[in-house]
Amino acid sequence: MLKNRIIGIFLLLLLLASCRQKEEVICYGTPTNDLMKLLDEEGYQLRIYPSVHEALQKAPKQAGVLLLSKSYPREGVKLDEADQKIIKEKSLRVFMEFPQCVGTTEWVTTDTLELERIVVCDSLNSLLPSMSLLSFQRCIMKQTPNPVANPLLVAAKVAGFNEAVYGLKDTPTQPILYFHNDRLLLSATCMSNFAESRYLPEQRVKALFEYIFNGC
């Protein structure tokens, strides 16, 4: 199931070899980022590097790496072919948000979400069942240049307050969180500034991050 796959990827991503143990987290991003502040407050050891390439070079083998947007919404994060080679050779697990390019593939088209809601495509936990809804208010997203199979979160105009009551059949969707490949998980928008961007409802946003960090 996608649920089990997400648990495994995110736990490795965030270096949570034990859910009861605070670990070192390799990061590219801004220390004032909401996610960075949350991890710091929770006692994680943040290793923040000035470039994507250096973060990947310094990461231990099989480590998790966070590549967070420094320039949202002006510019996305860039991952070149040399970086991809490092990820593969070191078996890294990478979360990257607001992509500008991955290798030779570019994300050039942006869109601002207006009436769309964020829909959970597969049950994550008791607060985030399949078809449950979140609101990423007026977030700016990068439209993927290629089709995405089995996205974890999508943006869509749906009926319902807490859940998409009619599902997603015949409804246009835009991928928000999805796997680019087995080593790289992409967010089409800046998820890490969840507080500043007022992602709602808070309880579900909190449940999403608790699931990511403590899902084992």
What are these regions, as identified by a protein language model?
Residues 72-150:
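A glycine-rich, often tryptophan-bearing local segment used as a flexible ligand/cofactor-contacting loop or short
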Residues 204-216:
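An acidic-aromatic substrate-binding cleft motif
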Residues 23-106:
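Helical hinge/lid and interdomain linker segments adjacent to catalytic or ligand-binding clefts
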Residues 16-24:
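Bacterial Sec-dependent signal peptides at the C-terminal "C-region" and cleavage site
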Residues 114-198:
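Catalytic beta-strand/loop cores that center a nucleophilic Ser/Cys/Thr
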Residues 6-15:
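Sec-dependent N-terminal signal peptides
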Residues 106-108, 196-200:
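A short, polar/proline- and glycine-enriched secondary-structure boundary/capping micro-motif
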Residues 1-3:
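N-terminal secretory signal peptides that target proteins for export/translocation
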